[in-house]
Design a protein with these regions (language model features):
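Conserved mid-core segment of classical short-chain dehydrogenase/reductases
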Residues: 1-12, 55
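Residue(s) in the substrate-gating loop at a strand-loop-helix junction
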Residues: 46
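Alpha-helical segment proximal to the catalytic Tyr-Lys
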Residues: 31, 75-76
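A short helix-coil junction within the Rossmann-fold of NAD(P)-dependent oxidoreductases
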Residues: 28-37
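Active-site helix of classical SDR
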Residues: 26, 62
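C-terminal helical subdomain
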Residues: 86, 102-140
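Active-site loop-to-helix junction immediately N-terminal to the catalytic Tyr of the SDR YXXXK motif
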Residues: 52-60, 72
């Protein structure tokens, strides 16, 4: 929950970095993208934007928000020669994740940035509208969250203490 760990400044920074900045950048780039007749907007969401995890409330909200913005934008731009791709990486071995001890046992299958980039490039080549990463465990959790969210609540409740310990020093900004 944002109130447990994130300061007001951290909450504001996450909203600005993960939601406000991409929206404003897209707005500034749209005239040139439209004029090109063959543009592409790539939005970086997160698998946590699809299945929200305890202790990542603010981060999940920003990533779900950018995914919803991307979907609305894709529909707004449909037929105008500008596509929108939303990327939902799972845990990625970046400096941001270096302070997290959450591993595969908690559903965090780490990938390299190169693996995420390769998947994104493949999705672009195939004219996909989204690419979801994070391994088979994450895919199963996404499906369960859509079909039976209470089962995900129950599963995460059983992991909550371990997850809290694993991410106690982690900052998602």
């Amino acid at each position: 929950m944002p109130g447990r760990r994130d300061t007001e400044d951290e909450i504001t920074a996450q909203l600005q970095l993960n939601l406000t900045a991409p929206i404003l950048l897209t707005r500034a780039a749209l005239p040139a993208l439209r004029a090109s007749g063959n543009g592409l907007v790539v939005m970086m969401s997160s698998a946590i934007g699809l299945v929200e995890m305890p202790f990542y409330g603010t981060y999940a909200a920003t990533k779900a928000g950018i995914a919803q913005f991307a979907e609305a934008l894709r529909r707004e731009l449909y037929g105008e020669g500008v596509g929108v791709l939303t990327v939902y990486p799972g845990a990625t071995s970046t400096p941001m994740m270096s302070s997290s001890d959450a591993g595969a046992d908690l559903g965090f299958d780490y990938e390299s940035p190169d693996e995420v980039a390769s998947a994104m490039l493949a999705a672009i080549a195939d004219d996909e509208i989204s690419v979801v990463r994070g391994g088979s465990e994450r895919s199963a959790m996404i499906a369960a969250n859509r079909d039976d969210p209470a089962s995900v609540d129950e599963k995460l409740a059983g992991m909550k203490a371990d997850l809290e310990r694993a991410v106690s020093e982690h900052s998602s900004i």
